From Swiss-Prot:
Subunit structure comment from the entry: Homodimer.
Active site feature: C50 (nucleophile)
Binding site for NADP(+): G203, A204, G205, E206, T207, I208
Taxonomic classification: Bacteria, Pseudomonadati, Pseudomonadota, Gammaproteobacteria, Pasteurellales
Name of the featured protein: Glutamyl-tRNA reductase
Domain notes: Possesses an unusual extended V-shaped dimeric structure with each monomer consisting of three distinct domains arranged along a curved 'spinal' alpha-helix. The N-terminal catalytic domain specifically recognizes the glutamate moiety of the substrate. The second domain is the NADPH-binding domain, and the third C-terminal domain is responsible for dimerization.
Similarity section: Belongs to the glutamyl-tRNA reductase family.
Pfam families: GlutR_dimer (PF00745), GlutR_N (PF05201), Shikimate_DH (PF01488)
Amino acid sequence: MTILALGINHKTASVNLRSKVAFDDQKRQLAFEQIQHRALAESVVILSTCNRTELYFHNAEITPREEHEDNIAWREQCFEWFAEIHQLEHNELRECIYFKQNMESARHLMRVACGLDSLILGEPQILGQVKQAYQYSENFYQSQNSHISTKLSRLFQRTFSTAKRVRSETEIGSSAVSVAYAACGLARQIFDNFGKLRFLLVGAGETIELVARYLIQHGAKNIMIANRTPQRAETLAERLNTPMQILSLSALQIGLNQADIVISSTGSPDMLISKEMVEIAQKQRQFDPMLLIDIAVPRDIDENAGELDAVYSYSVDDLQHIIQRNMAQREQAAEQAAQIVDEECKAFFEWLKQQQSSDLIKRYRQDAEQTRQELLAKALVALTSGQDSEKVLNELSYKLTNSLLHVPTQALQAMAKSGNSQGLQSFSKALKLEEQ
């Protein structure tokens, strides 16, 4: 039995190549069908994100020893299929692709799900993507009146519980390491109840979208968006499925007069919010605390605005200092997380070994029972035909003993022939035999 991980990621391949090996819904469905038709694996889970494409195969018939010729041949078959479905030359993929099997494949999957292998260390989105990949696979096999193999399913369930444990026992995801999240984290440190605050977001690009999503997730209900093109701000509000007040840049002063927190990120070459505008707003607001976070380069907000009473002003440079400090904390937490992954990985393989021994014992007993029934049937026929009962029973016991001892005897002879003294000793101990 072998679990094989095959993939490329942001560490091994360019964006261009990663885009070529991505699986959309149509290609994923085709992949499931081809893998099943070619009997490449008993089950497979396909993980495809912007930063990685990985396939986790389970094949019960392949030896787990990496150097074994069956294993090498199977890995090559999987690689050739992967190149074929993406219509890529082998040479283009060979240097970028990686293979991991059994313990290493399980450890890799757990590290991926915990965010330890992500471009942004500890990012939480990858766990949801791994869960979605598993669900896609489960849906396919159910549509075929089948299911994901027990062992591969157990690996993914163990992975999900490991990621949950890492999140609860370490600080891997507690500190913001992106500008957008750092800005929102700073706002939460200064104001504790987003639901009662009024926000002004300036811009409607990717960074502001991330900011808006974070604010909404943490209870913000009163958000204004000011943008040079109001239609783009309206599109953003629709995408977020949240009612927002849309302003043009010419109406910035109106928004400032109402805002407790201003977060700005535009591509404007000119400053948009002057110290004088903030001063006017503060008079309108009766000098209630105001937080200004400028994450634009060049600046959107006058750096001198922070000199005003009850105004807290931060720039992208301030946020970078926060991010650096938080990243150091995440790296420390990542060491703890890696230890948890190792523990859970070992625990999974202990379970796997128990399952394999149980399966082996079950098959051995089934074979023995089949032999017993066949010999018993012959003995009953002999007795019915009038043969001597003592002779029939002696023959039954003789043949049954020979049949049950045939395979173990062959194994002992093979070990003796190869000079496997350790194997002979283990066999002798297991059978409670005393050396003569």
